[in-house]
Swiss-Prot record:
EC id: 6.3.2.45
Listed name of the protein: UDP-N-acetylmuramate--L-alanyl-gamma-D-glutamyl-meso-2,6-diaminoheptandioate ligase
Pathway info: Cell wall biogenesis; peptidoglycan recycling
Protein task: Reutilizes the intact tripeptide L-alanyl-gamma-D-glutamyl-meso-diaminopimelate by linking it to UDP-N-acetylmuramate.
Organism of derivation: Haemophilus influenzae (strain ATCC 51907 / DSM 11121 / KW20 / Rd)
Gene Ontology biological process terms from the UniProt entry: cell division; cell wall organization; peptidoglycan biosynthetic process; peptidoglycan turnover; regulation of cell shape
Pfam families assigned: Mur_ligase, Mur_ligase_C, Mur_ligase_M
Domain of life the protein comes from: Bacteria
UniProt binding sites for ATP: 111-117
Gene Ontology terms, MF aspect: ATP binding; UDP-N-acetylmuramate-L-alanyl-gamma-D-glutamyl-meso-2,6-diaminoheptanedioate ligase activity
Cofactors that this protein relies on: Mg(2+)
Transmembrane segments: none
Keyword field: ATP-binding, Cell cycle, Cell division, Cell shape, Cell wall biogenesis/degradation, Ligase, Magnesium, Nucleotide-binding, Peptidoglycan synthesis
Length: 453
C-alpha cells in the first residue's frame, strides 16, 4: 500500500483530497498547525493520522509521495526537507488530475461567489437521480455531512477554486481539473494578495476553458460581463447562458425565492420549492439544474431533488434565537456577497423588521483595502452596522462607518463590540454576522449576552 503524506491536511480542500486518497486505498497521513474540528474529526474517523506541526521526523522514513498544500511556503521545515532530500512531491490539484480526474466526467463549479453552495446543489441533484458521483466541496455538504467522496459513477463534481495551486505552481487550482461540464458563476476581482487585477483572474479562467473538449459545455450568465469577456478570449466548447431570452431562466414565485419557476428555451418546465432563500441561490440552483441536464438528468427531476437540498454551514445559518432576536452566521466577505446575503435576508424577513449587520474585514483582499469603497453601499439593506477593527487591518473601519447611511458602530475589542450589538438589539431583530473566519466566537457571545439582557 503506497503511503501519501499531506502537508497542510486540515484545510477543507486538502482534507477532502486526504479522504479521497484513503478511499482509493492509499495509506494517508498528514500534518498541520491548525488541527481542529470538524476537519480533524472527519479525518480521524477515516483512520487518517494527523501530526501537529511540521517536525521533519514525520517524513522519516520517506513517504511514497508528499502532497504540498497551497498554504505551505519556503522556509517551512518539511518543505525544506522535501527539497533537500529530493522526496517525490506534488500539489493537491495535480495529484487529483493524475490519479482520479483524468478518468472521470468532471463537472467543475467556478466563480468568485456561490461555488460551495452550487457544488452542493449539483451533487445532491445527481445523488437523488441515482448517480452517486464523487465530489470535493470547499465546505461540509449539508446533505452528506462530509466535504469529499470518491463515488462510484463516472461523474466527479468539484468546487473549482481560482486560488493558486502551490508555492511551486502559481496557476489557479482549477487549471488542473479538465472539466467536461463547467459552471462559471461570476468573475469578480478577489484574492488581491495573488492577482494584480481582474484581467489576471480572467486569464486563469481562460486557461481552464482551453482544456474543455468540443463536446463539453460551459454555463454562464448572460448578464455577467466579466464572464462574457473571458469567453471572448476563446472557447471551443458548447456554451449555454442563463437569463431571459436565453436557454435557461428562473423567475421568483415568492419574493424570497423559496419558490421559483424554471424555464428552458422560453418554456416553463418545472418549479422548485425549497428551504433556501435569495435570488443568488435561485441563480445557483439554475446553474446546477443546467449542469445536471448535461449529464442526462431531466429538468423536472432536478427541480424535485432541490426540494430536499440542505445548504452547507455558514450560509445564512441560524445560530440561535433569544428573546425573539435571531442570530445568523454567513461566510460573506466580499462586497458582492455581502449585498447578496443581505438582500436574501431582507427578502425573507420583509421590510418591517430590523437587520443588524456585523462584519469582520478578515480576508486578505479585505485587509488590503481593495474593496474598501464598496463596503458601505453593500451594507445598505441593513438598519444598523457593527464592524470589528482587526489589529492587522491596514485601514480604518471608521472610514466605512462614516460612509454608511444608517447608524454604524465599530470597535477594536471584540467583547466591547458584542456589548454594543446587544445594547442596540430589540425583539424581532435579525443579527447577521459575516466573516470568512470564526470571528472569535462572536455568535455565541452575542447569544449569551442576549440571555442576560
Amino acid at each position: 500500500m503506497k503511503h501519501i503524506h499531506i502537508l497542510g491536511i486540515c484545510g477543507t480542500f486538502m482534507g477532502g483530497v486526504a479522504m479521497i486518497a484513503k478511499q482509493m486505498g492509499y495509506h494517508v497521513t498528514g500534518s498541520d498547525t491548525n488541527v481542529y474540528p470538524p476537519m480533524s474529526t472527519f479525518l480521524e474517523e477515516q483512520g487518517i493520522e494527523i501530526i501537529p506541526n511540521y517536525d521533519v521526523a514525520q517524513l522519516q522514513p520517506a513517504p511514497d509521495m508528499v502532497i504540498v498544500g497551497n498554504a505551505m511556503k519556503r522556509g517551512n521545515p518539511c518543505v525544506e526537507y522535501v527539497l533537500e532530500n529530493n522526496l517525490k512531491y506534488t500539489s493537491g490539484p495535480q495529484w487529483l488530475h493524475d490519479h482520479l480526474l483524468r478518468d472521470r466526467w468532471v463537472l467543475a463549479v467556478s466563480g468568485t461567489h456561490g461555488k460551495t453552495t452550487t457544488t452542493g446543489m449539483l451533487t445532491w441533484v445527481l445523488e437523488q437521480n441515482g448517480l452517486k458521483s464523487g465530489f470535493l466541496i470547499g465546505g461540509i455538504a449539508g446533505n452528506f455531512g462530509i466535504s469529499a467522496r470518491l463515488g462510484d459513477s463516472p461523474y466527479f463534481i468539484i468546487e473549482a477554486d481560482e486560488y493558486d495551486t502551490a508555492f511551486f505552481d502559481k496557476r489557479s487550482k482549477f487549471v488542473h481539473y479538465n472539466p467536461r461540464t463547467l459552471i462559471v458563476n461570476n468573475i469578480s476581482f478577489d484574492h488581491a494578495d495573488i492577482f494584480d487585477d481582474l484581467k489576471a483572474i480572467q486569464r486563469q479562467f481562460h486557461h481552464m476553458i482551453r482544456t474543455i473538449p468540443a463536446s463539453g459545455l460551459v454555463l454562464s450568465s448572460a448578464s455577467e460581463q466579466s464572464a462574457k469577456e473571458t469567453l471572448a478570449l476563446g472557447c471551443w466548447s458548447q456554451q449555454q447562458f442563463l437569463g431571459k431570452d436565453n436557454e435557461w431562466f428562473a423567475e421568483r414565485i415568492t419574493n424570497d425565492a423559496s419558490h421559483f419557476a424554471v424555464f428552458h428555451h422560453g418554456e416553463k418546465v418545472a418549479e422548485v420549492k425549497w428551504n433556501v432563500v435569495g435570488q443568488h441561490n435561485m441563480h445557483n440552483a439554475l446553474m446546477a439544474i443546467a449542469a445536471a441536464h448535461h449529464t442526462g438528468v431531466a429538468i423536472e427531476d432536478a427541480c424535485k431533488a432541490l426540494g430536499s437540498f440542505v445548504n452547507a454551514k455558514r450560509r445564512l445559518e441560524v445560530k440561535g434565537e433569544v428573546n425573539s432576536i435571531t442570530v445568523y452566521d454567513d461566510f460573506a466577505h466580499h462586497p458582492e456577497a455581502i449585498l447578496a446575503t443581505l438582500t436574501a435576508l431582507r427578502d425573507k424577513v420583509g421590510g418591517g423588521v430590523r437587520i443588524l449587520a456585523v462584519l469582520e474585514p478578515r480576508s486578505n483582499t479585505m485587509k488590503m483595502g481593495v474593496h474598501k469603497d464598496d463596503i458601505a453601499p453593500a451594507l445598505g439593506r441593513a438598519d444598523a452596522v457593527f464592524m470589528l477593527q482587526p489589529e492587522q487591518l491596514s485601514w480604518e473601519v471608521a472610514d466605512i462607518a462614516n460612509q454608511c447611511v444608517q447608524p454604524a458602530y465599530w470597535n477594536a475589542n471584540l467583547d466591547r463590540l458584542v456589548d454594543m450589538i446587544v445594547a442596540k438589539a430589540q425583539p424581532t431583530d435579525h443579527i447577521l454576522v459575516m466573516s470568512n473566519g470564526s470571528f472569535g466566537g462572536i455568535h455565541q457571545k452575542i447569544l449569551d449576552k442576549l440571555k442576560l439582557k
